């Protein structure tokens, strides 16, 4: 009988052991879930509209201001300071420490100010009178066409003038063609004579155009002093063209930004200073060739030809004056 009681005691002990372990497991599971929940909360993103700055999620700065210092509590507002009126702005909630620079309406490109820049709104530009642009965001406006035979539709800020066409009879068109032919042919002998004479003078002075194997024309004068032409060259170029050229020819972005910042509302001066800075950096040697060939590579051949004509005519005029002076001195 005592043996039966001993056997029953062993059975109860075996059953009670697993049950007590099961109860312990039930108790520790909630603690494990709580740890996981805390980790998930720490790793979660900030609420919508907030941004993590250091250890806290911060509110954004409102339009017209920029962040000066981070928030010091969860969900708090950072220290924000106003943008500079008329110089920079922000037009939406943001977390940046910088305002955006106001747009400049370039008068040389046919633009004028429609609405001034404020702390919360960028400058709004429009075409000047007698200029138009087809796109909503214009970098430059084109001059309106002037009609010779009447206007069908006037020029507007978004469309060019539509001119009335004059239809002529076959006889009048034929006479007009003969007239144009005469006007074109009459000056040809004089132009040929002048060109031959000029080439002879150049040959006498050892001044010849170099022969090139490629299609790109190399300037006849390689080491012309561009210093006195900088302003005239700048007048022929757009600010975007000047920035693109100097950027590709060694001027760092920080220097470009510095020049733009020093002359914020004077596009003409920005172009002059950018080109002058490049010329000082490059030096006189081959600067003229670099300018002309750089414009051609940028598919601005018409602009390169225009600048080339300005310099070539000036240099040719100086040489002709020098030759004339030498001839006068030899006669005396």
Swiss-Prot record:
What SMART domains does the record point to? DEATH, TNFR
Q: Which cysteines are joined by disulfide bonds?
A: 46-57, 58-71, 61-80, 83-99, 102-117, 105-125, 127-141, 144-155, 147-163
Residues recorded with modification Phosphothreonine: 212
Please list the GO biological process terms of this entry: activation-induced cell death of T cells; immune response; motor neuron apoptotic process; necroptotic signaling pathway; negative regulation of apoptotic process; regulation of stress-activated MAPK cascade
Q: Where is the signal peptide?
A: 1-16
Example of a GO MF term: calmodulin binding
TNFR-Cys repeat boundaries on the chain: 45-81, 82-125, 126-164
The segments annotated as topological domain Cytoplasmic are 193-332
Q: Where in the cell is it found?
A: Cell membrane; Membrane raft
Q: Which UniProt keywords apply?
A: Apoptosis, Calmodulin-binding, Cell membrane, Disulfide bond, Glycoprotein, Lipoprotein, Membrane, Palmitate, Phosphoprotein, Receptor, Repeat, Signal, Transmembrane, Transmembrane helix
Lipid anchor positions (S-palmitoyl cysteine)? 200
UniProt entry tagged with the keyword Iron: no
Q: Which residues are glycosylated?
A: 38, 116
Residues on the Extracellular side? Answer: 17-175
Regarding the membrane, this protein is recorded as: Single-pass type I membrane protein
Q: Which domain of life is it from?
A: Eukaryota
Q: What domain comment accompanies this record? A: Contains a death domain involved in the binding of FADD, and maybe to other cytosolic adapter proteins.
Its subunit composition reads: Component of the death-induced signaling complex (DISC) composed of cell surface receptor FAS/CD95, adapter protein FADD and the CASP8 protease; recruitment of CASP8 to the complex is required for processing of CASP8 into the p18 and p10 subunits. Interacts directly (via DED domain) with NOL3 (via CARD domain); inhibits death-inducing signaling complex (DISC) assembly by inhibiting the increase in FAS-FADD binding induced by FAS activation. Binds DAXX. Interacts with HIPK3. Part of a complex containing HIPK3 and FADD. Binds RIPK1 and FAIM2. Interacts with BABAM2 and FEM1B.
What protein am I looking at? Tumor necrosis factor receptor superfamily member 6
